[in-house]
Amino acid sequence: MATVLSRALKLPGKKSPDLGEYDPLTQADSDESEDDLVLNLQKNGGVKNGKSPLGEAPEPDSDAEVAEAAKPHLSEVTTEGYPSEPLGGLEQKAASSLVSYVRTSVFLLTLGISMILVLLCAFLIPCPPRDLHSTWSRHLGSQGGGDLSPLELADVNGDGLRDVLLSFVMSRNGSAVGVSRPAANLVCLSGMNGSTLWSSLLPEEARDITCLELMPGSLAETICLVTGTHKMLSAFNATSGKAIWTLNPNYLSNGTLAAPVVVLPDLDEDGVRDLVVLAIGELQPDLCFLLVSGRTGNPVGRPVKYNIVGVGNLIGPQVYITTNGAVYILFGFGNIQAVALRDIFVQAQNRDSSPPSLQIEEPEWEKRRSINLSELIDVYSDGVELLQMVKAPDSNCSNLLITTRQSLVLLRGQNLTPYWALRLQGLRSQPTPGYFTDDQTLDFLLQIQDGVGMKKMMVVDGDSGSIVWSYRAPCHMKETPATSAVTSDQKSVFLFWAEGLSAASPNSDIILGTEPPSLHHLYLLHPAFPSILLDLANTTGTVTASEVGINDLWKDAFYVTRTTGPSSEGHPAALVVSKLSLRWALMEGQMAQLQESTPKIGRGELRRFLSRIKFVEAPYEI
């Protein structure tokens, strides 16, 4: 009866910490509703281990059970009178702490192993070499004469940066007694810092150095072909500098080499491209073609002679491949004539048949054969000074850029008809191709002698032949080389040498003194700022050769010059090779304002523009 009455009088309230029961007198106004209690009860999963989720013990069935429940065990009450956590809760906390410890240990161990692997990769895997040396200069001593200044760029050590190859005549004091021709030296300098990679002795002065891959495929090694001024033709391994083969001079007993070697398609079907050299007779103007194997250096047949009538500079030889695939050799004396490679091969082999690749003909070219059906094809005959191959836009063939004494002419390669002609005089140096206008057609920078100690630079539009930029500047160096480099936005920067622009007004007619000034400046012209020239560098010597190479990894270009210092009687001129990073020079160069522009160009705007320039390989070949 007492038990029933106790249950009937039980009211909801807060649980007393001492008795574990709800006390209606201490019950405050609770914020929780009855629904919240029900939800909490469902969320906690109901009664577990004999206790309700609200902490309320099951109701006893007798007064004894009530009395027993009112006596808390010592294990459930702390010294402060509050109940301690159950033993199962301590075990769960211990297990949770162990799991956290294991997870932390695994994470730290994984992080440590990853850091060790990163450090190992950083030390073991070589990073691509960075061109840290923005500029260097190498003194190669004194050269003992020589009229030619061959210079070539090629990557010989596989570091992704083109190296510098050049040849020079050594001092005559060091040549052997009884040698009629002074020996020369072939040197390869590192493009990174100018150190000597290798050097080889040459029996005579070198006329030309050409480095290329004669075998198709990505694994082909680079070969450097060196043509001498007399009878030397040798192939060198570009990596080691060792001679692979040398043409026997006896095959040129009746003449000497007249021009650099020319690379041909594979004629003897041995998987290596072959060569042709042009020799000229000692006493008569007979020209002789000799086909040479690119693999062994032995002749591919006998010499083939042609009698040429003409007066002037020797032109070529150069190889021209038409749209249909016909192969012709261009050459001449003051004129341009062509002969099919098929005809040379048939005569050299003394047979009537030729490889299928040589049997292709170009109808428009064949129409120009002489009336007597001669093997020679007349291309151009009007005082020719220079001949260049220029890639035609949107075509796989090239046009012919011809420099004469009176004009500059562009011939269409497909039918040999004039595209345009520009009449001018005084042009003695080779036109420099590049992109100046926005029509993606190659334009040309010209250097024309314009009075004593003055020269005129002009840019000719390759599509129309009109002059789109010109400037007159002092310069006493004869035939100073000009170059160009292509940027990623299909524009070109043009580089040329002149004296300080403050030496004379660009439009003045003042004639400077005949004494040449001692300082020459390297100027850069960008088509986006035609009224500004950038002064990049200067030298007191005479620049005899220059080349531009591209660093593909860093999108930079570098400018290599070959310079000879002033010579005096009994003291040969010093030879200096220098390299200049163009992106570095653009930031350090001085701005020279040619004329006022609207709006006025600030130096900050110019520097921001120049800092975004990136250089790429030229898509054309000359």
Swiss-Prot record:
Region (Disordered): 1-68
Location in the cell: Membrane; Golgi outpost; Cytoplasm, Cytoskeleton, Microtubule organizing center
Keyword Repeat: no
Chain positions with Phosphothreonine modification: 26
The UniProt record lists the keyword Cytoplasm: yes
SUPFAM superfamilies per UniProt: Quinoprotein alcohol dehydrogenase-like (SSF50998)
GO CC annotation: Golgi apparatus; membrane; microtubule organizing center
Modified residues (Phosphoserine): 16, 30, 33, 62
Bilayer disposition of the protein: Single-pass membrane protein
Transmembrane segments: 104-124
Keywords: Cytoplasm, Cytoskeleton, Golgi apparatus, Membrane, Phosphoprotein, Transmembrane, Transmembrane helix
PANTHER family: PROTEIN FAM234B, PTHR21419
Family designation: Belongs to the FAM234 family.
Protein name per Swiss-Prot or TrEMBL: Protein FAM234B
Species: Homo sapiens (Human)
Gene (UniProt): FAM234B
